[in-house]
Amino acid sequence: MPTPTPPPEPFTVSPQPGLDLHGEEEGCGRTLVLVHGLTATRRYVIQGSRVLARTGGLRVVGYDARGHGDSSRPPDGLYGYPALVADLEAILDERAIERAVIAGSSMGAATAIAFCLEHPDRVGALVAITPAYDGQARTTAGALEVWDARAEALDAGDVDSFVALTGVDSLPERFRAAARLAVRQRIERHRDPSAVAEAVRQVPRSAAFDGLDRLSEIAVPVLVVASGDEADPEHPFAVAGEYARRLADARLVTEEEGDPPLAWQGARLSRAIAAFLDDHRA
């Protein structure tokens, strides 16, 4: 009989007193750190796929951001990008990771890039999955209105309103049901929705790095995973394309026309990451 695959190893890292970040790691080999998006958890970077840890020769480390999933709310009340970058540094330090591939989704992509700009010696490669950060914080009332409404829904425990405010009901019918279910399941994984609500207020108002021109400073190879606007308008294809254009060593991948976004397909996304890392083993 085949040897059973051991379960992921849970861990807790405390970047500051009163803040516990919960995560897990699995596999051995080159280290891949997963950094999730706003209102998501560690599961949603590669959609729960365990292919990379089990067959990809990688040590896969994932964690829930402050206030998300199983992690606690920060005692200082800060959820912006400087805090997220500091938390990522703490994860690497406490898990004895000198250098890693960092894969981030949406908010996590901006966090990973900001970390690489601050600590280039600790990053071997990047995977930017559906980047949405366009180089500046949101400042206008119009840009912030929907985020504040989503935060209010979370504070009220009104999951139905939160789901509706994500815009899933305006997606093409072939994507609508899956997107609606995914949003609902994602929100139900948080132990403290009011902490997530505060993150939803703060992150859009926070700057990860100052302008897309800074992308040219990144020397490591970067896999940019784009989604088509039809299924995922909140992560514009044009933004991912601009990342790929400005980065010194980038590969842009996306789904076939008419398919669900590659970022929604854990096994396919994992294979794309594995192929990219096979080409960049340094």
Describe the predicted segments one by one.
Residues 104-108, 112:
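Gly/Ala-rich beta-loop-alpha elbow adjacent to hydrolase catalytic centers
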Residues 249-282:
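Catalytic active-site module of serine/aspartate enzymes centered on a nucleophile-bearing elbow/loop
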Residues 113, 117-118, 123-155:
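Flexible "cap/lid" loop of the alpha/beta hydrolase fold
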Residues 15-73:
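Conserved HGGG/HGGXW glycine-rich cap/lid loop of the alpha/beta-hydrolase fold
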Residues 218, 224-226:
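Short beta-strand/loop motif that positions the catalytic acidic residue
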Residues 138-141, 156-205, 209, 214:
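Conserved alpha/beta-hydrolase catalytic His-Asp/Glu region
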